[in-house]
Design a protein with these regions (language model features):
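N-terminal beta-strand motif that seeds the catalytic metal site of vicinal oxygen chelate
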Residues: 3-16, 198-223, 256-263
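Catalytic cores of alpha/beta
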Residues: 27, 68-78, 111-119, 155-170
């Protein structure tokens, strides 16, 4: 998987405030058990270079706050999978390009983004400014609709979705999942926080239940019964009648022995990635995509309790 795509599908990049090479392997195990496999540490933090060298075998490890080409060379030699430079530095960008490693320069203004785009970059880093962060990001996205943004600081699991909900955002560096290098007894807590963050990012919720019928007339009658009894307004939506938004009555035998269940997610690409990590299989012939190429809907390969299950974009 290409690095930018890996960042996008993970969504969450765990920020390591105090890197410790001795804890790299247990940290990687704890994070991966929670569904996360990308980390970022500031390269000027004590022990950062050794941590990246130790963790790059297990995780996609990024080096942040790179200020000089020399620092970039050290980070790349240590095994950094991506670089976040402190500004738009053409020499750092060139060094990374030679190694086929993404360079994501920190961009604070439209002029910064323009300079990065002029150097051929399609993704940059953006550090939010408190509560004004989402508005500032929206302004940059309006000026540069083809640019993608890595959110690089000041984000927690409680605030990340304000950014991850934006289609231009690759991922967020999220603080608080790992506050310090985890000792052995902290591994379970790291895994728990990672799982909680993933579920918060995906924001799964039941969207509707699907009922299979043999034909349009039966579907009409079935949806009509729900309208009559419960006041769920019937609506013909082409391939199915809906009773409100809760019940989809198919006009033919469709997926699922008993019907289907739709589970909505904030981002279907990220949901599919996490579910595959958990062992789920997908029927990719059922996949539908948004005009921009993002996954919109896809069915699981296996039924659950006799129901087909599909993941649907919120």
């Amino acid at each position: 998987m290409k690095t930018l795509q890996q960042l996008y599908k993970n969504g969450i990049v765990v920020f390591i405030q105090t890197p410790n090479a001795a804890q790299a392997a247990p940290l990687a195990q704890a994070l991966q058990a929670g569904g996360l496999s990308c980390v970022l540490t500031s390269f000027d933090a004590p022990g950062a270079e050794a941590f990246i060298r130790a963790s790059s075998s297990f995780l996609l490890a990024g080096a942040g706050n790179i200020r000089t080409p020399q620092e970039a060379q050290h980070a790349l030699k240590a095994g950094a999978g991506f670089i976040i430079s402190a500004d738009v530095n053409p020499e750092i960008i060139r060094l990374c390009a030679e190694k086929n490693i993404p360079a994501l320069p920190e961009c604070r203004t439209s002029a910064d983004v323009q300079a990065a785009a002029g150097l051929g970059l399609t993704a940059v880093s953006f550090s939010p400014d408190g509560a004004n962060g989402p508005a500032a990001l929206n302004a940059l996205c309006a000026d540069f609709p083809d640019m993608r943004f890595f959110i690089s600081g000041g984000v927690t699991a409680d605030t990340m979705n304000a950014y991850l909900s934006h289609k231009a955002v690759l991922a967020c560096a999220v603080e608080g999942i790992v506050n310090n290098p985890p000792a052995e007894q902290d591994a379970a807590a790291v895994t728990r926080r990672a799982k909680e963050a993933v579920l918060k990012m995906l924001a799964f919720e039941l969207r509707h239940v699907g009922i299979n019928t043999p034909d349009a007339q039966t579907a009409d009658e079935t949806a009509g019964a729900f309208e009559k009894l419960f006041g769920f307004k019937k609506e013909d939506r082409g391939g199915a009648y809906f009773a409100a938004d809760y019940i989809e009555v198919m006009k033919k035998q469709f997926y699922g022995t008993h019907g289907h269940i739709a589970v909505a997610a904030a981002n279907v690409d990220r949901a599919a990635y996490q579910l595959e990590r958990a062992g789920a299989r997908f029927n990719w012939d059922s996949a539908g995509y948004n005009p921009d190429g993002r996954l919109r809907v896809v069915y699981l390969q296996d039924e659950i309790g006799g129901f087909a299950v599909h993941i649907l974009q919120k």
